[in-house]
């Protein structure tokens, strides 16, 4: 879905009109979040966000898996498989599955790390354990009560924060903010903005860990596009941030097209983009997630689509590493309720 503009402005008459619906939605979500989950038999680290839409969870999940491997863990990512038709539980195989099967994000991640897709997270956790997982990294699911979470790590964009602070549909929040903050163990703020500062202060006051990070362009991607003019397109939660990252990397973005998150590109849309690129002498560039979703259709265009990859760089990685180690050891010695 494409987020309404009023979600990211001070509360307006429209958001106030929708507040009663937001109150009902918030009550339902709060009730679900308070339910007791099932122990997975291994530590569960949840990478989530407070609001609908993108915040940088996928690059955070991949960065977290890398750190956990450095700690001699065998993490497996557990995903709901949004946008995919398979209910699972299933271990994603990029050679057999496509985005229509398992969703774009799980497919993209599975090219680097083991990923289990399951609508039922308890069943997914069981499969991951049978595949040798020493711990589970949940990509999203902060508001889902199915599994006991031993560490909840929230990702937030420094420019967007929590928007107008209202619960859906009056705003972008998935649940009332105080309850979500109460259940947050660590916060990763992506970027240099100040929109998340109040949330960070609230979490720090409760003893939570607050870290800064930034999205860093992949060096090979930058080198591949050096000296080229590009037409960039993206169907992700925050296309503007992606385009800004391209420009900050020195890429000459001559044209850009933003689509809704998880947008199902049609052949006609792709052909139109390719025709514009050919006419203007531009190189087509998109995200790894979008390219995973486009799949084999890209081969029919007659124009190459270049993926521009980004990774998450945490400013104080040693502190995050130590925090993870402490929380994992605690989870193994003292199970967490709820």
From Swiss-Prot:
Cellular-component GO terms for this entry: plasma membrane
Where, in this chain's numbering, is ATP bound? Answer: 51-58
Q: What is its EC number?
A: 2.7.1.130
Q: What is this protein called?
A: Tetraacyldisaccharide 4'-kinase
Q: Which family does it belong to?
A: Belongs to the LpxK family.
Q: What is this protein's gene name?
A: lpxK
User: SUPFAM superfamilies from the entry?
Assistant: P-loop containing nucleoside triphosphate hydrolases (SSF52540)
Which reaction does this chain catalyze? a lipid A disaccharide + ATP = a lipid IVA + ADP + H(+)
**Keyword Plastid recorded:** no
Pathway assigned in UniProt? Glycolipid biosynthesis; lipid IV(A) biosynthesis; lipid IV(A) from (3R)-3-hydroxytetradecanoyl-[acyl-carrier-protein] and UDP-N-acetyl-alpha-D-glucosamine: step 6/6
Coiled coil region boundaries: none
Listed GO biological process terms: lipid A biosynthetic process; lipopolysaccharide core region biosynthetic process
Q: Which UniProt keywords apply?
A: ATP-binding, Kinase, Lipid A biosynthesis, Lipid biosynthesis, Lipid metabolism, Nucleotide-binding, Transferase
| Described function | Transfers the gamma-phosphate of ATP to the 4'-position of a tetraacyldisaccharide 1-phosphate intermediate (termed DS-1-P) to form tetraacyldisaccharide 1,4'-bis-phosphate (lipid IVA).
Q: Which InterPro entries match?
A: LpxK, P-loop_NTPase
Show the PANTHER family listed in the entry.
TETRAACYLDISACCHARIDE 4'-KINASE, TETRAACYLDISACCHARIDE 4'-KINASE, MITOCHONDRIAL-RELATED
Annotated signal sequence is none
One GO MF term attached to the UniProt entry: tetraacyldisaccharide 4'-kinase activity
Query: Which Pfam families did the record assign?
Result: LpxK
